[in-house]
């Protein structure tokens, strides 16, 4: 059988972070070790019944078995606009400022195709979800990483970026609530970022998939589009995955500047065929009727967060108490040469799957990420195993 050479854009890629973790996990599981997976951010709880029932009804309609719209059903886009208005006080035109996505990852990965030419500079805040820089690299863009450090609350130091860099930049990727650090961004940060990007004509691509996983009803994460002037330069990516335990359904949305939304739509009409309409109809029900479920879900994650933070503190592992997202970003204990070394040792010796901080970028070295995606008993067991390593 012929062995064909990969294209350069693939051959030079590092292994995808979670693919490597899955490989080691499989090897350990094959030895009969009980695995507790706190690696990938995939909710362990099912999609709620009211969404599943809506899906069952939608699947039975023959009209939903045909090709869907590339940009999403107008009814779905209208419900996204309604939800944004209710949740964030943001007004959106569903016809021009909203587009449906086959999960937000799909939209983020395709977005640089619409606006980044070979050699264009794209700023990526790091540690980061790897898709931002990988998608940029696929289209020949030049990536400049902007470090996020604990001393600055994991916000980029915008003043440290020279004016000449802003002049060159075509786009900046930001992500709050942040994966992997669980940091949130205050209004003042967004105001400053928008001011700079409007001045230098830089596109803001904001990934905000975790806004509905927060722990204080009086401190809800905001949309960047709440800030005056944001629509001039911003597209915001959101998802139903984490909000309603729908990671496998592959449904999300991008909203904001009409020309940015249209550009992404131009790419999508040439590379995919849209979201299965039955999924869109069920998603309409989720967005319209899901507030009570989201409140209950936050309560579960709050208990899990508190259990893990207390357990880590008890064994002397330092971590910040997150106010949003279902991740704990903790410091690697002394005695390990790298976060990858620590995570590998934990997995091989205890069966607990963690994510090494350096897998998200150089500033993540010295940290590891815990996903709160198992029940409290298993979380306590996981930390106990780590403590006894």
UniProtKB/Swiss-Prot annotation:
The modification N6-(pyridoxal phosphate)lysine is found at residue 242. Its cofactor is pyridoxal 5'-phosphate. Coiled coil: none annotated. The keyword Endoplasmic reticulum does not apply. Transmembrane segments: none annotated. Substrate binds at residues 16, 41, 105, 129, 179, 369. One of its GO terms (molecular function) is L,L-diaminopimelate aminotransferase activity. Its EC number is 2.6.1.83. Keywords: Aminotransferase, Pyridoxal phosphate, Transferase. InterPro entries: Aminotransferase_I/II_large (IPR004839), DAP-NH2Trfase_DapL_Desulfo (IPR019881), DapL/ALD1 (IPR019942), LL-DAP_aminotransferase (IPR050881), NHTrfase_class1_PyrdxlP-BS (IPR004838), PyrdxlP-dep_Trfase (IPR015424), PyrdxlP-dep_Trfase_major (IPR015421), PyrdxlP-dep_Trfase_small (IPR015422). Pyridoxal 5'-phosphate binds at residues 70, 104-105, 129, 179, 210, 239-241, 250. PROSITE patterns: AA_TRANSFER_CLASS_1. The keyword Transferase applies. It catalyses: (2S,6S)-2,6-diaminopimelate + 2-oxoglutarate = (S)-2,3,4,5-tetrahydrodipicolinate + L-glutamate + H2O + H(+). Homodimer. Involved in the synthesis of meso-diaminopimelate (m-DAP or DL-DAP), required for both lysine and peptidoglycan biosynthesis. Catalyzes the direct conversion of tetrahydrodipicolinate to LL-diaminopimelate. Belongs to the class-I pyridoxal-phosphate-dependent aminotransferase family. LL-diaminopimelate aminotransferase subfamily. NCBIfam families: DapC_direct (TIGR03540), PRK09276.1 (NF006756). This is LL-diaminopimelate aminotransferase. It comes from Nitratidesulfovibrio vulgaris (strain DSM 19637 / Miyazaki F). The gene is dapL.
């Amino acid at each position: 059988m012929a062995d064909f050479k990969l294209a350069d854009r693939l051959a030079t890629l590092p292994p995808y972070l979670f693919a490597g973790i899955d490989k080691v996990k499989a090897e350990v599981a094959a030895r009969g070790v009980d695995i507790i997976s706190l690696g990938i951010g995939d909710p362990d709880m099912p999609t709620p019944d009211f969404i599943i029932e809506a899906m069952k009804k939608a699947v039975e309609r023959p009209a939903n078995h045909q090709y869907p719209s590339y940009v999403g059903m107008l009814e779905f886009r209208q419900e996204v606009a309604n939800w944004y208005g209710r949740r964030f006080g943001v007004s959106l035109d569903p016809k021009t400022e909203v587009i449906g996505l086959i999960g937000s990852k799909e939209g983020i990965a395709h977005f640089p195709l619409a606006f980044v030419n070979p050699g264009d500079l794209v700023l990526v805040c790091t540690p980061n979800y790897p898709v931002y820089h990988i998608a940029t690299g696929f289209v020949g863009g030049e990536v400049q990483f902007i470090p996020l450090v604990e001393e600055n609350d994991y916000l980029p130091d915008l003043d440290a970026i020279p004016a000449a860099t802003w002049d060159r930049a075509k786009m900046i990727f930001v992500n709050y609530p942040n994966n992997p650090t669980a940091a949130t961004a205050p209004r003042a940060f967004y105001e400053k970022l928008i001011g700079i990007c409007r001045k230098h004509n830089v596109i803001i691509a904001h990934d905000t998939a975790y806004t509905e996983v927060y722990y204080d009803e009086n401190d809800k994460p905001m949309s960047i589009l709440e800030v005056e002037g944001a629509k001039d330069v911003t597209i915001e990516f959101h998802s139903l995955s984490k909000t309603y335990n729908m990671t496998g359904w592959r449904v999300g949305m991008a909203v904001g500047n009409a020309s940015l939304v249209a550009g992404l739509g131009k790419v999508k009409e040439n590379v995919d065929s849209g979201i299965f309409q039955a999924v869109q109809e069920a998603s309409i029900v989720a967005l319209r009727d899901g507030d009570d479920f989201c409140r209950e879900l936050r309560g579960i994650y709050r208990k899990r967060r508190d259990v893990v933070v207390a357990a880590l503190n008890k064994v002397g592992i330092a971590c910040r108490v997150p106010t949003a997202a279902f991740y704990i970003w903790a410091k690697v204990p002394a005695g390990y040469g790298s976060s990858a070394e620590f995570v590998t040792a934990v997995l091989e010796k205890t069966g607990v799957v963690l994510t090494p901080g350096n897998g998200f970028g150089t500033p993540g070295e010295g940290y590891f990420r815990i996903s709160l995606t198992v029940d409290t008993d298993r979380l306590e067991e996981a930390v106990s195993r780590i403590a006894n390593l």
